[in-house]
Amino acid sequence: MINSNNQVLSEIRFDWNKKEILEILNMPLIDLMWESQIVHRKFNSYNIQLASLFSVKTGGCEENCSYCSQSIYSASEIKSHPQFQVEEVLARAKIAKNEGADRFCMGWAWREIRDGKSFNAMLEMVSGVRDLGMEACVTAGMLTEEQASRLADAGLTAYNHNLDTSPEHYKNIITTRTYQDRLDTIKRVRNAGINVCCGGIIGLGETNGDRASLLEVLSNMNPHPESVPINSLVAIEGTGLEDNQEIDSIEMIRMIATARILMPKSKIRLSAGREKLSKEAQILCFQCGANSIFYGDELLTTSNPSFQSDRKLLKEVGVSFNKDFETCEKTLSSL
């Protein structure tokens, strides 16, 4: 909550309302940054989790998400790829581990998981990643209770299923899946004992109120999502949002800081669109509460800062991270 002096009281809550969140989101930036740092220092160390993201199956998704080049409704020219073999994925995971990745995230461009050979291969991949001593995360659309249970049995650490935007703005972004579908998927994941990875995207044409509404839904989940990816739109030619303007970096800093205040213990992951942020803006995001990044030259179908530039940045900032990332020279992009 906010006291009479406009200070945020650092406590873990699950009953934030939109009015309170807007007050935080709209605080003078210097005050917002100060308050978020207080919360971040109380609940977390300045340790950055390094996550590697690999597209196991690219393109051909049946959903019509207007920001996504992997949708069958998109006119984007992307290089589609059928599902990689288990051995190929685990070889990538092993390289990621040697590079210092703490978590290996695997993405499938699917509307939903379907039982059969592909799902069985996914289970093998999850088990294989865990056998390497890494956290395993999957993002593959909707799933059933039984599928969630089987993923849990395979050792899945986290399942990513983003809300994208507010309930009010959602219908302007996607119509092939409802907001409730997303919430139901998250519930099944949680009921199976798998950590929830859930966040959103800014720059979709939403208002500040929409951003507060998205954060309200996330911060009222009990427990809070284990990790919260905050993405900024990467406008891709051929998608429905190709003409959207880039967001100002201050908007990302505000979103990161507010998310940290609302969800003190969650990993706040600075995700897609990070390449557009200056070094200084990224440093402010880390200062305000971001404590996880995706590293590697590409995130599914969008670009990302280079391995070398990230390593240099983290060393300059003075945060702690896996030391293998500091010494390894080989990168996934070199394969």
Swiss-Prot record:
The catalytic activity of this protein is classed by the Enzyme Commission as: 2.8.1.6
A GO BP term here is: biotin biosynthetic process
Q: Which residues bind [2Fe-2S] cluster?
A: 105, 137, 197, 269
MF terms per GO, please?
2 iron, 2 sulfur cluster binding; 4 iron, 4 sulfur cluster binding; biotin synthase activity; iron ion binding
**Taxonomic superkingdom:** Bacteria
Q: For this protein, what reaction is catalysed?
A: (4R,5S)-dethiobiotin + (sulfur carrier)-SH + 2 reduced [2Fe-2S]-[ferredoxin] + 2 S-adenosyl-L-methionine = (sulfur carrier)-H + biotin + 2 5'-deoxyadenosine + 2 L-methionine + 2 oxidized [2Fe-2S]-[ferredoxin]
Alphabetically sorted, this entry's keywords are: 2Fe-2S, 4Fe-4S, Biotin biosynthesis, Iron, Iron-sulfur, Metal-binding, S-adenosyl-L-methionine, Transferase
Q: Which cofactor does it need?
A: [4Fe-4S] cluster; [2Fe-2S] cluster
InterPro entries, from UniProt? Aldolase_TIM, BATS_dom, Biotin_synth/BioAB, Biotin_synthase, Elp3/MiaA/NifB-like_rSAM, rSAM
| Classification via CDD domains | Radical_SAM
Keyword Phosphoprotein belongs to the record: no
Q: Outline the extent of the Radical SAM core domain.
A: 46-274
Cofactor note (record): Binds 1 [4Fe-4S] cluster. The cluster is coordinated with 3 cysteines and an exchangeable S-adenosyl-L-methionine. Binds 1 [2Fe-2S] cluster. The cluster is coordinated with 3 cysteines and 1 arginine.
Residues annotated as binding [4Fe-4S] cluster: 61, 65, 68
Please give the pathway this protein is involved in.
Cofactor biosynthesis; biotin biosynthesis; biotin from 7,8-diaminononanoate: step 2/2
Functionally, this protein is described as follows: Catalyzes the conversion of dethiobiotin (DTB) to biotin by the insertion of a sulfur atom into dethiobiotin via a radical-based mechanism.
Under the subunit heading, UniProt states: Homodimer.
Output this protein's name. Biotin synthase
Organism annotation: Prochlorococcus marinus (strain AS9601)
